[in-house]
Regions:
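Predominantly a Rossmann-like dinucleotide-binding segment in NAD(P)-dependent oxidoreductases
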Residues: 45, 52-132, 253
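A short helix->loop->beta-strand "cap" motif at the edges of active sites that frequently abuts
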Residues: 15-17, 42-44, 149-150
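Active-site loop of classical SDR/Rossmann-like NAD(P)-dependent oxidoreductases
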Residues: 203-217
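Hydrophobic residues in well-ordered beta-strands that form the structural core
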Residues: 21, 46-48, 153, 178
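Beta-loop-alpha module in the N-terminal Rossmann-like domain of NAD(P)-dependent dehydrogenases
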Residues: 1-38
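Residues at the C-terminal ends
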Residues: 14, 40-41, 224, 251
Length: 260
């Protein structure tokens, strides 16, 4: 459970064990601040589980950006829709959509754009079954980066067509598109449909199987070779800062400046 991430991370580190920790680092920045001195003193490798950095499509798009294939990024769009919401009991203790779901996208935005300065979020309550959770079940977030680039994140906890996972990066000299993955590449055209395709994959373990494998491989290689791990503790903290800013923005309707 998330409340045990920091205690277990520190316990493992004190025992001299390298750590691969699931997101988020905590449910509240106060917990991070209370443990900051201990976190800063950790000497073993600590990697955070933002697995989408290792998704082959997202990673290839990032590599193309780094290679200058589209020039400087001006706009980034991240669309993440789940087939169905988790149980209401889980949502109530998860920290909410921004800490539990969008936090991956906050890290992806930083992965592509660098540091974020402003956050605006609009939360939606679309599913009556989740009304009593006290959380949003869909959200749209706008992030303004220090570079001047803008990211738009679209999240929804229900999508009838499956696990909808897309990314678009637009630059001065071109654009990159990471599309959905399907079970097969077969397309059907006949008298009733044109270009019908397989549904999207319907579970995150299927969609991100390669990402989880490559993430674990990168962690093991870094530990064995003594090379730096990434994403870092600092990346975990930065994503939580953005999640808290988005929550505050969605509740108040105000743009929130990110504390440096």
């Amino acid at each position: 459970p998330t409340p045990l991430h920091i205690p277990h991370l520190l316990a493992a580190a004190k025992a001299g064990k390298a750590v691969l920790c699931e997101k988020p680092i905590a449910l509240d920045m106060k917990d991070v601040e209370a443990a900051q001195a201990e976190l800063d003193s950790v000497k073993v490798p600590v990697m955070f589980g933002f697995n989408r950095r290792f998704d082959p499509s997202f990673a290839a798009a990032r590599a193309a950006v780094e290679a200058g294939r589209i020039g400087d990024i001006e706009q980034l769009t991240i669309i993440i829709r789940d087939p169905a919401a988790p149980p209401a009991e889980y949502i109530k203790v998860s920290g909410g959509i921004f800490r539990d779901m969008t936090i991956h996208d906050f890290d992806t935005a930083r992965f592509f754009l660098g540091e974020i300065e402003e956050v605006y979020a609009a939360g939606q309550n679309l599913d009556p079954a989740l009304k009593d959770t006290g959380d949003f079940d869909a959200a749209v977030v706008t992030l303004k980066a220090a570079s001047g680039a803008v990211a738009t994140i679209i999240n929804n906890r229900h999508c009838s067509s499956g696990y909808d996972q897309r990314l678009e990066a637009s630059g001065r000299e071109g654009a990159l598109f990471a599309e959905n993955i399907r079970a097969t590449t077969v397309r059907l055209s006949n008298g009733e449909v044109t270009d019908a395709q397989e549904p999207y994959l319907d579970f995150f373990l299927e969609r991100y199987a390669d990402a989880y494998r490559d993430e674990l491989t990168a962690f093991i290689d870094a530990v064995n070779n003594g090379s730096p791990v990434t994403p870092t503790v600092e990346d975990g903290v930065a994503a939580l800062v953005l999640a808290e800013a988005a929550e505050r923005s969605a509740r108040t309707g105000q743009t929130v400046e990110v504390e440096k």
